Design a protein with these regions (language model features):
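Bacterial N-terminal signal peptides that target proteins for export
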Residues: 1-9
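Boundary at the C-terminal end of the N-terminal hydrophobic targeting segment
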Residues: 20-24
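Bacterial N-terminal signal peptides
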Residues: 8-17
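Post-HExxH zinc-binding segment in Zn-dependent metallohydrolases
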Residues: 506-559, 636
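Auxiliary, metal-adjacent structural segments of Zn-dependent hydrolase domains
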Residues: 409-473
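Active-site recognition of the HExxH zinc-binding catalytic motif
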Residues: 477-508, 530
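C-terminal, non-catalytic "cap/extension" segments appended to globular domains
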Residues: 27-305, 333, 337-410, 582-697
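Flexible, glycine/threonine-enriched loop-and-boundary segments that flank and lead into catalytic domains
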Residues: 453-462, 482, 611-624
Length: 697
């Protein structure tokens, strides 16, 4: 997962009064367009033309109209508005260019400094540095950027930007963007910053809601040695503590290489189902002092000790289920996001902002791409191949089948031994980054350059990549390393996060303007990270790709895209449901999530797996703490395959990765056209999967 500017834990009960009160704040009066404004716009525009000449009319009309669109009555009367226009409209092209460069440089310092404050405030909650205290949660829930938008409209900087640089629609970017220079793109991105005027209190409440959800997810671990099967036997090693959903899913995948892994896979799937349905006993979450039989759903005091934690004196071991906390956190993010809706007339829902503004890919197009993968005839053919390789009928958890990967030749214990020996600490992984990068095809000079711009921290959660926001700062790779070293799951995730960090470094340090920093949307950085992650065994010296292994890798990509497309579709349908039922309770949201997960499963997965009403598509943690993040993953799989084909054509991952990352934040299709020669879509992956099937069969 990639984080650039992350928006602690308020309980849902504590959050609701704040949200309810704030929801009344955007009054009709405060959002209404002042009655005098149209006449003032005409007068201010005419005055500019009279002063500077007819040549600036078109630019003046657009700039004044843009400024007026976000002017509020509290900003001042007609005389004040016209004064702001006279003061801040720039007629001279050279002066306008100078102002743009100053704005770009100063916004970099602003973004970077606030970003570093935010990172520091979240240090204790994000990193594995001991217990989280209430003061840590309070700092983590504070957003230092919350007042910037308010302040910059109040001090007229935002209006200066709107008067001089064009607010462009997505249609305009798609139509005209291919002809724009890098500076024109940067000017458009600068103006995009001020396309909405969300009040500071709303921005802060959104940040607090997501921080609360993130803290909940980051602490949601299961102690696996304390899971008991129907015979009361322990199936997992002592000390194994897995975070939901990432480590649970990856442990399930790891069991494909174990001869006796099937019972453990079934048990993990049962644990996942208990989490999604919230029938999991609350006492077992991140608790090594309780034994749990997930099939019978019974709990008892732990009969073994595999933790250095003291037993809490007041702990009561009860089977009472988790009280819909998972869905209370999700509902908290939804209610917070709704507060921004009145201030976003062009994108009046979180759904519209997620797709139209952030991804710049329409929701309908994304859904069509997901459905194209989910309904492909290739799914049944690949499923039959998996079934034949397993020698048994498919079970629902086989959506995570990973037997196409060469790692299937190694047990998880063998891989853990290698990675723990190689990376006993986060510092050891950091020291190995230059070797990893040269192994991926980067020159020694570029590998050294990148390693100098990346630092490694011990993650409290599964791990994430937090890029820098100004030149001079470093990207942070957060990875989970246990007392005995980095296990294979951690290494695989760390490579993914390293891919993010490398992209983040190139797309910050090596773009011509700060306003162009980044990639088109998060799916692109996920795609680039997948390219790193897929080379894990090769980097460990355990596998060399040949034609057959590459074909199997393509089938693995396809099966992964199939699985995550279903998960993403559940995420999208769930947000639509919340908007249709804004007064829902956590219990009602739980019921809706289960219904949507089952319906999506029955539509696309049951015909393949032969079992209905499965809820596993609802297990992903990002569904709770990242607000419509999940569609980035299937889009990322599609993009990743297009990138891999381009790398295969040229033969050098390092050179191509750098070339692509340095394009900056263009629109998705333009970025992809310049990177690979084709727009974003599943076509390349589907065609490659069909060819791979022919080769493997």
């Amino acid at each position: 997962m990639s984080t650039r500017l992350l928006a602690g834990a308020l309980t849902f009960a504590a959050l609701l009064p704040i949200i309810t009160h704030a929801a009344t704040s955007p009054t009709t009066a405060s959002l209404a367009r002042p009655a005098w404004l149209d006449a003032s716009v005409a007068k201010a525009t005419a005055d500019l033309v009279a002063t500077h000449g007819e040549a600036i009319r078109s630019r003046a009309e657009r700039g004044v109209r843009q400024a007026a669109s976000l002017w509020r009555a509290e900003d001042g009367d007609a005389a004040v508005f016209e004064g702001v226009v006279r003061t801040h409209f720039i007629a001279d092209p050279a002066t306008r260019d100078t102002v743009f460069r100053r704005l770009d440089a100063l916004h970099e310092q602003l973004d970077g400094s606030l970003h570093e404050i935010n990172r520091a405030f979240r240090w204790q909650t994000d990193l594995d540095l001991g217990p989280i205290l209430p003061i840590d949660e309070a700092f983590a829930g504070y957003d230092p950027t919350a007042h910037v938008n308010d302040d910059f409209f109040a001090n007229r900087i935002a209006f200066a930007v709107l008067l001089n640089f064009p607010l462009t629609t997505l249609d305009e970017k798609l139509r005209d963007g291919p002809k724009w220079s890098p500076q024109q793109w940067a000017e458009a991105r600068l103006a995009d910053r001020y396309a909405r005027r969300v009040p500071a209190d709303v921005a802060q409440q959104i940040a607090s809601a997501y921080s609360s959800a993130d803290n909940y997810i980051s602490s949601y671990n299961v102690w696996m040695h304390h899971l008991l099967d129907e015979r009361g036997q322990r199936q997992f090693p002592a000390g194994q503590r897995l975070i939901t959903h990432w480590n649970l899913r990856d442990e399930l995948k790891a069991q494909y290489s174990a001869k006796d892994g099937l019972p453990r896979q079934r048990m993990i799937a049962q644990v996942m189902e208990r989490i999604v349905t919230q029938s999991i006993p609350a006492v077992v979450v991140d608790n090594p002092h309780v034994d749990w039989q997930p099939y019978a759903n019974t709990v008892a005091p732990a009969a073994v000790n595999d933790s250095d934690r003291a037993v809490p004196t007041a702990m009561k071991i009860l089977a009472d289920r988790e009280p819909d906390t998972r869905y209370a956190r999700l509902l908290g993010t939804f209610q917070a996001e709704r507060l921004a809706d009145p201030y976003s007339p062009a994108a009046p829902t979180r759904i519209a902002r997620s797709f139209d503004d952030e991804r710049e890919l329409p929701e309908a197009r994304v859904e069509a791409m997901l459905v194209e993968v989910l309904s492909s005839p290739l799914v049944r053919r690949v499923a039959k191949l998996i079934e034949s390789r397993l020698g048994r009928p498919l079970e629902p958890f086989d959506i995570w089948y990973n037997g196409f990967r060469p790692r299937g030749a190694y047990t998880e214990a063998q891989l853990d031994e290698i990675t723990r020996r190689k990376n006993p600490t986060p510092a050891a992984f950091a020291a190995d980054i230059p070797n990893i990068l040269t192994g991926l095809g980067f020159s020694p000079q570029r590998a050294k350059y990148l390693a100098e711009h990346i630092t490694v921290d011990p993650a409290r959660g599964a791990g994430h990549a937090w890029g820098a926001a100004r030149r001079g700062d470093k990207a942070h790779l957060r990875t989970r390393v246990g007392p005995s070293g980095m296990d294979y799951k951690g290494y695989n995730i760390a490579l993914h996060e390293l891919g993010h960090n490398v992209e983040q470094t190139f797309s910050l340090y090596d773009v011509p303007f700060h306003s162009l920093e980044g990639v088109p949307n998060t799916a692109f950085t996920e795609a680039l990270a997948f390219v790193f992650q897929d080379r894990d065994l090769e980097l460990l010296g355990l596998a060399r790709p040949d034609a057959r292994s590459e074909a199997l890798g393509t089938l693995d990509d396809f099966w992964g895209a199939f699985e995550i497309s279903g998960v993403a579709l559940v995420d999208m349908r769930l947000w639509r449901w919340m908007y249709a039922h804004p007064a829902a309770t956590p219990a009602e949201l739980r019921a809706a999530t289960l219904q949507i997960a089952r319906q999506t499963w029955n539509e696309f997965f049951a015909p393949v797996f032969g079992r209905k009403d499965v809820v596993l598509l609802g297990i992903y943690s990002h569904m709770i703490d990242r607000g419509l993040y999940l569609p980035n993953y299937p889009i990322g799989h599609m993009i990743a395959h297009q990138i891999k084909e381009q790398v295969h054509r040229t033969g050098n991952l390092g050179t191509e990765f750098e070339r692509m990352s340095r394009q900056g934040r263009l629109t998705p299709d333009l970025w992809m056209q310049r990177a690979t020669g084709a727009p974003v879509g599943p076509g390349a992956l589907l065609a490659a999967a069909e060819a791979a099937l022919e080769q493997v069969q």
